[in-house]
Amino acid sequence: MRLHDWDNFYVIVGSSAAALTGLQFVVIALGAEVASLRDPTAVEAFGTPTIVHFCCVLTIGALVSVPGQTPFTLGSLFTFLGIAGVIYTIRTAHRAKLQSGYEPVLEDWLWHVAFPFGTYAALLITGASAFLYPAGALYFVAGVALSLLFIGIHNAWDSAVYISTRGRD
């Protein structure tokens, strides 16, 4: 398993996730003036998961960059992250149903529930397979990291557009 071959990839992806996490804080702060976003359950359903996705990408980058990682440690950590992500996505779906500040449409269910669920499930499976196929697992984990980054970017943009078009209530 040649982790050093992935250094630049995870520096770029992890740094992007960290920077976008900061920008999401700005989006949430701007959204404080929009009445429908004053419902904490709506923020938990549509804002917080974006931060979680970015932080997961940052965590993946950090884990791969730690010296001395073995297929066992990485596989275990990725499996744990995958399980946590699947559980968190199920909770996100429940929160999206409970909140009253916004009526989710199909696109919301896809980008906030279905795509993240599939991506975290892929991380879980990849983590479990890292014990048998460590080199191949690194490619799948890279795909998971990019998928979560793009899901987060889409959802952050969607939030920004929603806030800007709703105006001040």
Q: Could you describe each region identified by the protein language model?
A:
Residues 122-169:
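Terminal transmembrane helical module of multi-pass membrane proteins
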Residues 24-44:
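Membrane-interface helix-loop junction between the first two transmembrane segments
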Residues 7, 11-12, 38-59, 101-119, ...:
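Juxtamembrane helix-loop boundaries in multi-pass membrane proteins
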Residues 63-120:
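Membrane-proximal helix-loop-helix units in multi-pass membrane proteins
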